[in-house]
Amino acid sequence: MSQERPTFYRQELNKTIWEVPERYQNLSPVGSGAYGSVCAAFDTKTGLRVAVKKLSRPFQSIIHAKRTYRELRLLKHMKHENVIGLLDVFTPARSLEEFNDVYLVTHLMGADLNNIVKCQKLTDDHVQFLIYQILRGLKYIHSADIIHRDLKPSNLAVNEDCELKILDFGLARHTDDEMTGYVATRWYRAPEIMLNWMHYNQTVDIWSVGCIMAELLTGRTLFPGTDHINQLQQIMRLTGTPPAYLINRMPSHEARNYIQSLTQMPKMNFANVFIGANPLAVDLLEKMLVLDSDKRITAAQALAHAYFAQYHDPDDEPVADPYDQSFESRDLLIDEWKSLTYDEVISFVPPPLDQEEMES
């Protein structure tokens, strides 16, 4: 929203009024969720197909207002090939007093990893390239002290050239309801986050990458649990039951009691589970799908694993600038979050145009 204010036009889409700058044409709805609706559009200024997201009721409560600020701050910070970044942010409002709507513009990504897995079992080389890119993006996100928390195939966008971007990071705060039953929101979640075992760290995302990688190699969901308990049973069938030292570290009395009540199971031999897979892939999976999060491989370590030998380049796996998230602990009023958000909209500077993208 920098420079002079553009000319806006209004149209109704899915019973919602959209008011956007004239540069964005041919808006067509592509989906909506709890936090907003998304239209595909053509950006006449760059020649790119873009996704425009209109946040729904961004300032209706303190929770909403803080979430809006969080999403904008995160997207503005992310500048990496394998992470979705912000192309534009705008509001039709001419002043803070009028400010009520926020629109975010990102690249329009064709397919997600779900579409790709459904269509075919991937070659080992495809799996290497896709997982390498996820880890390259995660190394960047984690270096800014951000945890994705909700990595799953539908949050990984892939284009025709197999180039991948991570979507929707750092925002996920799922309700219990959304995590209940036979749902993909939970199948990729690390056990410690799913069951509130203990304070979790960035390696919750590595667990998810392990689940995704196993699915790419086999064509099937690794742990398609019907509920929390069934999911834990499926996980432990593979990893074995947690050792005593790990159980003792769990602050939750209920979690400790429940796990101590389970029949002891040994860890399975991963080579017998992933028959026919590249032995290096199996070795990496064993380092990702570890119950003890302190012993799980990190994104930076995983990039240096022999499985990615043909892609790994330590000089081209960048880290992020420091990200100040001290706002997370602040208790502010709606109007204060709104004012901070308005400042972020106004101060936005669009990224330099990528020649390759404009030609594609």
From Swiss-Prot:
<keyword id="KW-0067">ATP-binding</keyword>
<dbReference type="GO" id="GO:0033554">
    <property type="term" value="P:cellular response to stress"/>
</dbReference>
<dbReference type="GO" id="GO:0035556">
    <property type="term" value="P:intracellular signal transduction"/>
</dbReference>
<dbReference type="InterPro" id="IPR000719">
    <property type="entry name" value="Prot_kinase_dom"/>
</dbReference>
<feature type="binding site">
    <location>
        <begin position="30"/>
        <end position="38"/>
    </location>
    <ligand>
        <name>ATP</name>
    </ligand>
</feature>
<feature type="modified residue" description="Phosphotyrosine; by ZAP70">
    <location>
        <position position="323"/>
    </location>
</feature>
<dbReference type="GO" id="GO:0010831">
    <property type="term" value="P:positive regulation of myotube differentiation"/>
</dbReference>
<protein>
    <recommendedName>
        <fullName>Mitogen-activated protein kinase 14</fullName>
        <ecNumber>2.7.11.24</ecNumber>
    </recommendedName>
</protein>
<feature type="modified residue" description="Phosphotyrosine; by MAP2K3, MAP2K4, MAP2K6 and autocatalysis">
    <location>
        <position position="182"/>
    </location>
</feature>
<keyword id="KW-0597">Phosphoprotein</keyword>
<keyword id="KW-0418">Kinase</keyword>
<feature type="domain" description="Protein kinase">
    <location>
        <begin position="24"/>
        <end position="308"/>
    </location>
</feature>
<feature type="modified residue" description="Phosphothreonine; by MAP2K3, MAP2K4, MAP2K6 and autocatalysis">
    <location>
        <position position="180"/>
    </location>
</feature>
<dbReference type="GO" id="GO:0005737">
    <property type="term" value="C:cytoplasm"/>
</dbReference>
<feature type="modified residue" description="N6-acetyllysine">
    <location>
        <position position="152"/>
    </location>
</feature>
<keyword id="KW-0053">Apoptosis</keyword>
<feature type="active site" description="Proton acceptor">
    <location>
        <position position="150"/>
    </location>
</feature>
<dbReference type="InterPro" id="IPR011009">
    <property type="entry name" value="Kinase-like_dom_sf"/>
</dbReference>
<dbReference type="InterPro" id="IPR050117">
    <property type="entry name" value="MAP_kinase"/>
</dbReference>
<keyword id="KW-0804">Transcription</keyword>
<dbReference type="InterPro" id="IPR008352">
    <property type="entry name" value="MAPK_p38-like"/>
</dbReference>
<dbReference type="InterPro" id="IPR038784">
    <property type="entry name" value="MAPK14"/>
</dbReference>
<dbReference type="GO" id="GO:0106310">
    <property type="term" value="F:protein serine kinase activity"/>
</dbReference>
<keyword id="KW-0007">Acetylation</keyword>
<feature type="modified residue" description="N-acetylserine">
    <location>
        <position position="2"/>
    </location>
</feature>
<dbReference type="InterPro" id="IPR003527">
    <property type="entry name" value="MAP_kinase_CS"/>
</dbReference>
<dbReference type="GO" id="GO:0005634">
    <property type="term" value="C:nucleus"/>
</dbReference>
<keyword id="KW-0808">Transferase</keyword>
<keyword id="KW-0539">Nucleus</keyword>
<dbReference type="GO" id="GO:0045663">
    <property type="term" value="P:positive regulation of myoblast differentiation"/>
</dbReference>
<dbReference type="GO" id="GO:0038066">
    <property type="term" value="P:p38MAPK cascade"/>
</dbReference>
<dbReference type="Pfam" id="PF00069">
    <property type="entry name" value="Pkinase"/>
</dbReference>
<keyword id="KW-0963">Cytoplasm</keyword>
<comment type="similarity">
    <text>Belongs to the protein kinase superfamily. CMGC Ser/Thr protein kinase family. MAP kinase subfamily.</text>
</comment>
<dbReference type="GO" id="GO:0004674">
    <property type="term" value="F:protein serine/threonine kinase activity"/>
</dbReference>
<comment type="subunit">
    <text>Component of a signaling complex containing at least AKAP13, PKN1, MAPK14, ZAK and MAP2K3. Within this complex, AKAP13 interacts directly with PKN1, which in turn recruits MAPK14, MAP2K3 and ZAK. Binds to a kinase interaction motif within the protein tyrosine phosphatase, PTPRR. This interaction retains MAPK14 in the cytoplasm and prevents nuclear accumulation. Interacts with SPAG9 and GADD45A. Interacts with CDC25B, CDC25C, DUSP1, DUSP10, DUSP16, NP60, SUPT20H and TAB1. Interacts with casein kinase II subunits CSNK2A1 and CSNK2B. Interacts with PPM1D.</text>
</comment>
<keyword id="KW-0832">Ubl conjugation</keyword>
<keyword id="KW-0723">Serine/threonine-protein kinase</keyword>
<feature type="modified residue" description="Phosphoserine">
    <location>
        <position position="2"/>
    </location>
</feature>
<dbReference type="GO" id="GO:0006915">
    <property type="term" value="P:apoptotic process"/>
</dbReference>
<dbReference type="GO" id="GO:0006357">
    <property type="term" value="P:regulation of transcription by RNA polymerase II"/>
</dbReference>
<feature type="modified residue" description="N6-acetyllysine">
    <location>
        <position position="53"/>
    </location>
</feature>
